[in-house]
Amino acid sequence: MKTLLLTLVVVTMVCLDLGYTRRCFNQQSSQPKTTKSCPLGENSCYNKQWRDHRGSITERGCGCPKVKPGIKLRCCESEDCNN
């Protein structure tokens, strides 16, 4: 009986994927593509763009930060959606 209960618990955890975390791109500007697993509970990715003396800058990561005026922000909620 204990073995059956333990088996059911393990199968439930695998099926529900209780430890699921969102994966987002996190490379900056024109660097090679890299991804990171977001903290548990963080379900969105962002792509932030602006211009400065270096030219066009792109920042990517987990979450959906607040930005200052003049900065383009795109937030999304699917795997690797912020490229």
From Swiss-Prot:
GO molecular function: acetylcholine receptor inhibitor activity; ion channel regulator activity; toxin activity
Keywords per UniProt: Acetylcholine receptor inhibiting toxin, Disulfide bond, Ion channel impairing toxin, Neurotoxin, Postsynaptic neurotoxin, Secreted, Signal, Toxin
Localization (cell): Secreted
GO cellular component: extracellular region
Top-level taxon of the source organism: Eukaryota
PROSITE patterns registered for this protein in UniProt: SNAKE_TOXIN
Range of residues in the leader sequence: 1-21
Tissue expression: Expressed by the venom gland.
Residue pairs linked by disulfide bridges in the UniProt entry: 24-45, 38-62, 64-75, 76-81
Entry similarity comment: Belongs to the three-finger toxin family. Short-chain subfamily. Type I alpha-neurotoxin sub-subfamily.
Function text: Binds to muscle nicotinic acetylcholine receptor (nAChR) and inhibit acetylcholine from binding to the receptor, thereby impairing neuromuscular transmission.
Name the UniProt record assigns to this protein: Short neurotoxin NCA-02/NCA-05/UER-05
